A protein has these predicted regions:
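Metal-associated gating/positioning segment near the N- to mid-region
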Residues: 51-118
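Short catalytic-loop micro-motif centered on adjacent basic/acidic residues
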Residues: 94-96, 124-127, 236-241
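Short, acidic/polar
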Residues: 75-83, 133-143
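N-terminal metal-binding scaffold of metallo-dependent hydrolase/deaminase domains
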Residues: 1-42
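Divalent metal-coordination and catalytic microenvironments
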Residues: 9, 22, 27, 52, ...
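Histidine/acidic residue-rich metal-binding segments in metalloenzymes
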Residues: 135-309
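Active-site metal-binding motif and surrounding structural segment of the metallo-beta-lactamase
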Residues: 37-56
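A glycine-rich helix N-cap at a beta->alpha junction
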Residues: 115-129
Length: 309
């Protein structure tokens, strides 16, 4: 395989920025130095002049939903299109999700990997677990052997079969994951709160109402629920797409109790507010959890800067 020499770029590392040359061979960085002599390299080495440009490590996006099939529709980006767009934006690795929608978790994983063949960048998968099985530990063992390191659990969406609503069954899944060295990540919204609000709702179902029907209190309650299970088992828990100050306060409360809570958020919860749900373009901003307030934006931004997220 031919080599690539990136010349005189401003290389950005965690602690420093310097003008360096980078030699890449076999898709791996072989050497980083102030100056690499082209004449010492194979004759077919490609030289990329990076004068005046920054050279950064590729971004890893640990939460993507390409070609997600749900409720009779599918997300806009295919694996091929989405991964090419990611590459143009500097994202070189994504971690998507295998649904729990086949006879076994391993079957679901194999099917998802077949669908991901057109990917233009590196990828991995989290495995969704949407229902309890008596042989759940054997199933988890099989997907771990197949390369899975992270599970995805929901505390909502009972109506579409994503919710393991029996606490002891959910605790068993957590314990088996701990025994096998698997991380459990959780979409946190309390389904009871969401369901009760929806069933008693007297107004219309407009995009802006989505924020009222899935409030920050639901996120906070679910975080404390799964955090309690993690505390009982002395294991970490990973909260995906944190959206609110109240949710952040629940995370802080758990951490004060000694629970290891890992948290991610997303650009839309950092910078957009529920006002985007108003008007003719409102449907384009419907997501779950919903967009919140400017106060929530500011709380998450501060937590990101200080390392809580």
């Amino acid at each position: 395989m031919s080599s690539i020499l990136i010349k005189n770029g401003l290389v950005v590392d965690t602690e420093w920025m310097r003008h360096y040359d980078i030699l890449i061979s076999g898709s791996k960085i072989q050497r980083v130095a102030p100056s690499i002599d082209y004449s010492t390299l194979p004759h077919d080495t490609t030289v990329v002049r990076a004068d005046g440009l920054c050279v950064l490590p590729g971004i890893i996006d640990a939460h993507t939903h390409y070609h997600l099939v749900s409720r009779g529709t599918v997300t806009a980006d295919s694996f091929e299109e989405g991964s090419r767009l990611a590459a143009y934006g500097g994202v070189t690795t994504v971690v998507d999700f295998a649904d729990d929608n086949k006879v076994s978790l391993l079957d679901s994983l194999h099917q998802r990997r077949k669908e991901m063949v057109p990917m233009a960048i590196d990828y991995a998968l989290h495995q969704g677990v949407y229902k309890y099985r008596p042989d759940i530990k054997k199933e988890l063992e099989s997907i771990k052997r197949a390369g899975i390191g992270t599970l995805k659990i929901f505390t909502t969406y009972k109506d579409v079969g994503y919710l393991v609503d029996d606490r002891e069954e959910l605790k068993t899944i957590f314990k088996d994951a701990k025994d096998l060295g698997l991380m459990v990540s959780v979409h946190c919204e309390d389904d009871k709160i969401v369901t009760e609000l929806s069933s008693s709702w007297k107004g219309q179902y407009r995009p802006i109402d989505h924020a009222a029907l899935r409030p920050a209190e639901a996120e906070a309650a679910a975080i404390e629920y799964v955090g309690g299970i993690a505390a009982e088992l002395d294991m970490p828990v990973y909260i995906v797409h944190l959206s609110s100050r109240k949710g952040l306060e629940s995370v802080r409360k758990l951490r004060m109790q000694g629970v290891k809570v890992i948290v991610e958020t997303t650009p839309h919860y950092l910078f957009l507010t529920k006002e985007k749900l108003e008007g003719p373009e409102g449907p384009l901003y419907v997501m779950t959890p919903p967009l919140r307030t400017e106060d929530d934006n500011e709380a998450l931004q501060e937590a990101l800067v200080n390392g809580e997220i």
